[in-house]
Amino acid sequence: MPELPEVETVMRGFRDAFEGHRISHVTVNRPDLRWPFPADLREKLEGHHVLSFRRRAKYILVRLEGGWSMLLHLGMSGRLTIGRAGTNATPPAHEHLVLETDSGARAGLVDPRRFGMVDLVRTSEEDSHRLLAHLGMEPLSDAMTGPALAELFRGRRSPIKSALLDQKLIAGLGNIYVCEALFRCGIHPERQACTLTGEETAALAEAIPQILEQAIASGGSSLRDYVQADGTKGAFQDLHLVYGREGVPCPNCGAEHPIQRITQAGRSTFFCPTCQK
């Protein structure tokens, strides 16, 4: 599933092509993904200018004149392809929704597994939408501080990795970047969240935004299906220190201490048992 840096990267590509332009045509190639498309989707989009974009956790919000926003989630393997309308290129398979602007931009939502979703919400009520209302703090916001994390983790006996992945606490973090952040901070993923010291929560509050910003600058991590909006792969996978590197020597403590993989809550966790305590 695309994580925060990948969604942010896609959102920026979408924004660059569509912001300030009028949606001239909407093509719905199937009536649903995870859930049915809104019955009035075409009515709310066609003929309206795109005012701005916003990312909330792993969701993209497209704000339109008329007071409505389109809410988009890419699901497990969805992607958004940006190009030019009117070309003779064959549309990709599993392209379920196409938006075109008066400037000739084209966006196609491709989702082979159909775990993504599209919905409409009044712009003034975005944060009350059922999928957004219970999300936690944004890790790239000023709210991400050591004391704030310490308060979130107070009394929580769950593993720190599970706490960081809890979208009700911190919105948008995923498996890749949590593994990387815990490694950089020397924190074992199975540690109880409530045992972290003030120094450790401060280190996490600094490392998490740094890693996310580095990943965004690299276009995200292309491991399976993910590509940027222009169809090119991201490059941050080449900078992973632990994720997907089981058996590789630890970049900190060397060949005698390879990276290990364990399973937590059904997900692979990569870490160094020597460096991370």
Swiss-Prot record:
It catalyses: Hydrolysis of DNA containing ring-opened 7-methylguanine residues, releasing 2,6-diamino-4-hydroxy-5-(N-methyl)formamidopyrimidine; 2'-deoxyribonucleotide-(2'-deoxyribose 5'-phosphate)-2'-deoxyribonucleotide-DNA = a 3'-end 2'-deoxyribonucleotide-(2,3-dehydro-2,3-deoxyribose 5'-phosphate)-DNA + a 5'-end 5'-phospho-2'-deoxyribonucleoside-DNA + H(+). SMART domains: Fapy_DNA_glyco, H2TH. GO terms for biological process: base-excision repair. DNA binds at residues 94, 113, 156. The active site is at residues 2-3, 58, 267. The keyword Transferase does not apply. The keyword Acetylation does not apply. InterPro entries: DNA_glyclase/AP_lyase_DNA-bd, Formamido-pyr_DNA_Glyclase, FPG_cat, MutM-like_N-ter, Ribosomal_uS13-like_H2TH, Znf_DNA_glyclase/AP_lyase, Znf_FPG/IleRS. Its EC number is 3.2.2.23, 4.2.99.18. Its cofactor is Zn(2+). Binds 1 zinc ion per subunit. It comes from the Bacteria. Pfam families: Fapy_DNA_glyco (PF01149), H2TH (PF06831), zf-FPG_IleRS (PF06827). Keywords: DNA damage, DNA repair, DNA-binding, Glycosidase, Hydrolase, Lyase, Metal-binding, Multifunctional enzyme, Zinc, Zinc-finger. One of its GO terms (molecular function) is damaged DNA binding. A zinc finger (FPG-type) spans 241-277. Belongs to the FPG family. Monomer. Involved in base excision repair of DNA damaged by oxidation or by mutagenic agents. Acts as a DNA glycosylase that recognizes and removes damaged bases. Has a preference for oxidized purines, such as 7,8-dihydro-8-oxoguanine (8-oxoG). Has AP (apurinic/apyrimidinic) lyase activity and introduces nicks in the DNA strand. Cleaves the DNA backbone by beta-delta elimination to generate a single-strand break at the site of the removed base with both 3'- and 5'-phosphates. HAMAP family: Fapy_DNA_glycosyl. This is Formamidopyrimidine-DNA glycosylase.
